[in-house]
Amino acid sequence: AKLHAEGRFHEIEKLLLIAAAAEYGAHISGGIPMSQVEIIRPEAMGVSKSDIRRYEDAVADVVAAGSTDAVKARLAELIKDMQGATTFGDSGLDETHAEIHEQMRKFSEAEVVPHAHEWHLKNEYIPMEIVQKVAELGVFGLTLPEEYGGMALGKESMCIVSEELSRGYIGVGSLGTRSEIAGELILNHGTEEQKAKYLPKTATGEILPTAVFTEPNTGSDLASLRTRAVKEGDTYRVTGQKTWITHPVRADVMTLLVRTNPKEKGYKGLSMLLAEKPRGDDANPFPAEGMTGGEIHVLGYRGMKEYDISFDGFTVPAENLLGGEE
């Protein structure tokens, strides 16, 4: 509606809209494929059969209109004519977001694209010089409040930044998400002391966080995780296994999800620790006592590296319990 009102809704925007609507409509009505063996049907999301019947003809019309060979052929022709563009059609971004997009596009073209293929082939870390430049662009504090050194921009800005940096190399595009996860957790649930300690340094990139959630045999079912943290005086002692942890070697702080109350099943027994650790390298990935791990070699998504991690008596100060309460 905005693009139409401003006279910016042309043929390519219309075709992109109806093609996308057809794709989404087909998935929502027929089932959203979560994996090769799992499909979420509308009924599973609480949609009644009467509501499904009420809208199924309209959805079928949308799917049919956007799935024709003519639509696909014309859209392909228009995209071909725009070869070299980073986006197709008018994105509808306002002036601020358009400036962010252009800034990230230029950085990606100049600093990332020329080197990305070599980083991938050699399975190398993204150089710290690039990480520092990403920090200087404000990426790590993009959505944090100004009082903590952030830029106080919205989630849409983070989407734009992640998308444009990922166009150069997916690992660079994901750098900011580690800080985004930690920043969101600490900002919304941390004590005032934890916010003051971690958020400003996260915003500048002085602290690189990593999310340590998933475990073998549980995957994204975080309510079933088993890694234990037992409080002994003013310290938590952590024991357990984690897997598919992104960029843990060079991280300074782990947002470490653990079970502090084994009597409570599911989410109620879980707590989050802000677990500090020294940075490692390929020769000595985890110098911290009570922490070991091995790299998970992957075909793609390189640059930060994935790891299995084992904790055996790894200690975290009790004051680093997120929010101060289990």
Language model feature labels by segment:
Residues 205-213:
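A short, Trp-centered hydrophobic/proline-enriched beta-strand micro-motif
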Residues 174-193, 219-222, 235:
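N-terminal glycine-rich flavin-associated loop
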Residues 217-220, 244-247, 262-264, 298-305, ...:
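Short Gly/Pro-enriched turn/cap motifs at secondary-structure boundaries
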Residues 235, 239-289:
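A short core secondary-structure module
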Residues 281-313:
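Flexible, small-/acidic-enriched active-site or ligand-binding loops
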Residues 108, 138, 145, 161, ...:
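Buried hydrophobic positions in well-ordered alpha/beta secondary-structure cores of metabolic enzymes
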Residues 1-122, 127-148, 152-155, 159, ...:
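Flavin-dependent oxidoreductase catalytic core characteristic
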Residues 133, 221-239:
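Cytochrome P450 C-terminal beta-domain/meander region
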